From Swiss-Prot:
Function per UniProt: Member of the two-component regulatory system RssA/RssB involved in regulation of swarming motility which has been shown to be inhibited by saturated fatty acids. RssA/RssB regulates cellular fatty acid composition, hemolysin production and cell surface topography. RssA/RssB negatively regulates the activity of SlhBA. It can also act as a negative regulator for the control of the swarming initiation. RssB binds its own promoter.
Keywords: Cytoplasm, DNA-binding, Phosphoprotein, Transcription, Transcription regulation, Two-component regulatory system
Keyword Membrane carried by entry: no
Protein's recorded name: Swarming motility regulation protein RssB
Knockout mutant characteristics: Mutation in either rssA or rssB confers a precocious-swarming phenotype on LB agar: swarming occurs at 37 degrees Celsius and is initiated at a lower cell density and more rapidly than the swarming of the parent strain at 30 degrees Celsius. Both mutants also exhibit increased hemolysin activity and altered cell surface topology.
Location of 4-aspartylphosphate modifications: 51
Location(s), subcellular: Cytoplasm
Pfam families, A to Z: Response_reg, Trans_reg_C
Species name: Serratia marcescens
Upper taxonomic lineage: Bacteria, Pseudomonadati, Pseudomonadota, Gammaproteobacteria, Enterobacterales
Effect of residue 51 to E: No phosphorylation
Cited CDD domains: REC_OmpR_PmrA-like, trans_reg_C
Alphabetized GO MF terms: phosphorelay response regulator activity; transcription cis-regulatory region binding
One GO biological process term: regulation of DNA-templated transcription
DNA-binding region residue numbers: 124-218
Length: 219
């Protein structure tokens, strides 16, 4: 498991690296948000440990920005105890867990393992096409081991396409699934949602069969 640690405190950073490496994890440690963004762009990380107070910005605001941009790496926030209340109120912004400083290293390792188990267990109850997974129970989607942030319409659209993967799904069927009976539907509503879905899962995964509907390719 590859972990990106974003922590500016030298003493704490060294201690975290040492403890996590002894526990069997691979660590990459950076001290600035800018460096974290560069590392994220290169990929290959399974989890991030993110300090909130960093020299070049606020970690929580950066978390919100990352999630808004579709960055779905699991993130455990590290925060000073006096920021817990505001942190709890912000977990909906995308943090997977948090720890208040000072914390015991064994507790951190347990939290990391717990998040890893949750992510690994995701695929056990999903439909899958290559690296694309859909969990119909929890209404979640993963691509390349990262959670995708889909709108409700995008999720239902993908659900129907994956249910019928390898076959053409008629536009009328998709519109019925998305909008139901009696709903007013703009002429290009389906195309707009399909465009947004393709942008998130990869435009080449879905084939347009002109005049008929759409087909989600099997891997």
């Amino acid at each position: 498991m590859n972990i990106l640690l974003v922590e500016d405190d030298l003493q704490l950073g060294k201690a975290l690296c040492r403890a996590l490496e002894l526990a069997g994890f691979n660590l990459c440690w950076v001290r600035l948000i800018a460096d974290a963004e560069n590392k994220l762009s290169s990929g290959g990380f399974d989890l991030m440990l993110l300090d909130l107070t960093l020299p070049d910005g606020d970690g929580l605001q950066k978390l919100i920005a990352w999630r808004a941009a579709g960055q779905n790496i699991p993130i455990i926030i590290l925060t000073a105890r006096d920021r817990i209340e505001s942190l709890v109120n912000s977990l909906d912004s995308g943090a997977n867990d948090f720890l208040a400083k000072p914390f015991a290293l064994p507790e951190l390792i347990s939290r990391v393992k717990a998040v890893n188990r949750r992510m690994a267990g995701f695929a056990s109850q999903t439909w899958s096409l290559g690296a694309l997974y859909l969990d119909p129970v929890n209404h979640q989607v993963m691509l390349d081991n990262e959670l995708l942030m889909l709108s409700k319409k995008e999720y239902h659209l993908l659900h129907e396409l994956m249910r019928c993967a390898g076959t053409v799904v008629r536009k009328a069927v998709l519109e019925q699934r998305l909008f139901g009976h009696g709903d007013s539907v703009e002429s290009n509503s389906l195309e707009v949602h399909m465009h947004n879905l393709r942008r998130k899962i990869g435009k080449d995964r879905v084939i347009t069969v002109r005049g008929i509907g759409y087909l989600l390719k099997k891997e």
